Amino acid sequence: MIVAALLLAVQVIAQNPRLERLDPDTRSAVTIVVDSARGAGLPVEPLIQRALEGTSKGAAGARIVAAVRRLAADLGAARVALGTGASTPELEAGVAALRAGATPQVIAHLRDVRRPPLTIALSVLADLVASGVPADSAATAVLALAPKARDADLVEFRRAVEHDIALGAPPGAATSVRVNAGADFGNSSGSPGTVPRPRRP
């Protein structure tokens, strides 16, 4: 078993010499994850980049391995939701959306209602949650806009919601109002309208 693992490590390192930056134990564990992901048809570059990011930040080997394993699992979950034809950027955006709180069912529904690529739509969903919008509200908004909105429209929608939140609007309310108003996609001034600020008690 040990010999097989060492041989596998040599093969993967030959294909990805950057892994030599890892200490031997970490490199061996990461190599197994990378090879397994490759065998499953998942992109391995994000895994390698995650490992290199960890070592560049001085993270402990165990944390690096755990992060790589988690990413591999999340990439697998994203591919199940998005389908085998999903690109690497779509899968990475899918991972971000899943980690933000979107369910696999939401991502699969998005795939059904919007033409690929879905990278921007998934990224907007994740960004909305990061801005404080509840995950279910963000998902509902993106799904409502996805069938007809262009990528640029979705980006503008996200900016408009973030703008309203910065002015004091509750994240959920800002999202709902923007969806109902069409997010002012055609506003040529570049200054989106705002939802009313909440009254101070």
Please report, for each region that a protein language model flagged, where it lies by residue.
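Sec-dependent N-terminal signal peptides
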Residues: I2-Q11
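General marker for long, soluble alpha-helical cores
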Residues: V12-P201
